[in-house]
């Protein structure tokens, strides 16, 4: 089990000079852009390992498409989901469903997939390379045609970001935006140009290995719960 406290970890979002604060701003910009570009009508959003939901809730609080959005945010730590419930209530967002549970399970998303926006923020820093690629493969089932996946990954050496982009692009996604490589944190957005495959009900999309481990097979953290 990971010794990191994922509830107190969110405090860095409140520091304007932190890398996480910058990353949050990037993610929110991509969410706004995806909502701005979404066709008229309902918009479905899935957030994997949603934490306190600051990215999505922070945008929807003031976005003109807020009433069109039905979203499910899945997060393992109940303290974080409690915080997300408070934020959603304060923003008067009844279209958000906040689930305390294992974000790796496809059963959490099957009735809302494929979605117009998929948030995979904080996933890719604690998986093996194989599980990152596997999760991206599942994005072809989670994401609707024309939908967007917003994702994050720190640029540890060796920098895996180019391979992540290649994995997306090899599965029918086109790059919409990528953050400046001069920063340690990275945010990307890829739009799905293919047709979504069916999502199986009982699959496990990924398992976690611990912070900044790309190749080792040993799982040291709980599934569905990391922020790399």
Locate the predicted segments by residue.
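Class I SAM-dependent methyltransferase Rossmann-like catalytic core
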Residues: 1-40
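Conserved class I S-adenosyl-L-methionine
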Residues: 39-51
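Conserved SAM-binding loop of SAM-dependent methyltransferases across substrates and taxa
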Residues: 52-66
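S-adenosyl-L-methionine
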Residues: 83-111
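A short SAM/SAH-binding and catalytic strip from SAM-dependent methyltransferases
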Residues: 115-131
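A short glycine-rich, Lys/Arg-flanked "PGG" loop and its adjoining helix->strand segment in the class I
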Residues: 132-145
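Conserved beta-strand signature within the Rossmann-like core of class I S-adenosyl-L-methionine
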Residues: 143-154
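SAM/dcSAM-binding transferase cores
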Residues: 177-178, 182-228
